[in-house]
C-alpha cells in the first residue's frame, strides 16, 4: 500500500513496510503492534478533510472508495504475511479524535473564579462517543472480520480507556490526555 502524494520517491510507505517485514522475519520477532490514526487513510477527520489517500496499485487516482479498498487489501495482506512467518499481530484501534485541541479545550473549561478546570465544561467539549464510533466504523468493521477469522490477529480498543458516559474525554482536571486533537 502506498500513500498518494508528490514525494513518494523519498517517502515510500510500501518500501518501508517491506523493509520492516524483512527485519521482523530476520530477527525472528514474534509480536508486532500496528498503531496509527487509521481513519486518516480511510475517512479523514470528522468533516472529511485531512485525508491521506492510499492505493494498492501504482496509480494516483484519489478517492475515498479507492483508499478504503486499499486499506482492506493492505490489512488482509499484512495479516497473511505475518501469519506466514508465525508473528502475532496486535492492532490498536485509534484513539478517539477530539474536535478541538487540548489547549483550546482547557482554556475554554477554565473557571477563573475557582482558579481550576471545570470538569463538566471539559467533558462537554470532549467528543461524543457515537461521533467517534461513526468515524471509525469502516475500519472497525474490516478489522472485526479478520479478528474473527485469525487467531494470530488481536485487537486493543483504546475506547475502553478514553470513553465513558457517552463521551471520549480529552482529559481531567489535572492534565490532558492529548497534545492536540488527535495525538496523545
Language model region names:
Residues 1-184:
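Extracellular glycan-modifying ectodomains
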Amino acid at each position: 500500500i502506498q500513500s498518494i502524494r508528490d514525494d513518494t520517491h523519498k517517502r515510500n510507505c510500501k518500501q518501508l513496510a517491506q523493509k520492516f517485514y524483512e527485519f521482523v522475519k530476520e530477527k525472528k520477532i514474534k509480536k508486532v503492534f500496528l498503531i496509527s490514526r487509521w481513519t486518516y487513510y480511510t475517512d479523514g477527520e470528522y468533516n472529511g478533510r485531512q485525508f491521506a489517500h492510499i492505493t494498492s496499485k501504482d496509480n494516483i487516482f484519489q478517492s475515498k472508495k479507492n483508499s478504503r479498498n486499499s486499506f482492506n487489501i493492505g490489512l488482509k495482506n499484512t495479516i497473511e504475511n505475518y501469519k506466514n512467518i508465525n508473528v502475532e499481530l496486535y492492532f490498536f484501534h485509534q484513539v478517539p479524535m477530539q474536535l478541538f485541541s487540548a489547549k483550546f479545550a482547557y482554556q475554554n473549561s477554565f473557571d477563573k473564579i475557582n482558579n481550576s478546570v471545570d470538569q463538566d465544561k471539559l467533558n462537554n467539549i470532549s467528543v461524543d462517543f457515537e461521533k467517534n464510533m461513526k468515524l471509525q466504523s469502516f475500519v472497525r468493521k474490516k478489522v472485526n472480520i479478520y479478528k474473527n477469522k485469525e487467531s494470530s490477529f488481536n485487537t486493543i480498543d483504546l475506547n475502553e480507556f478514553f470513553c465513558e458516559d457517552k463521551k471520549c474525554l480529552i482529559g481531567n482536571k489535572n492534565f490532558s490526555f492529548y497534545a492536540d486533537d488527535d495525538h496523545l
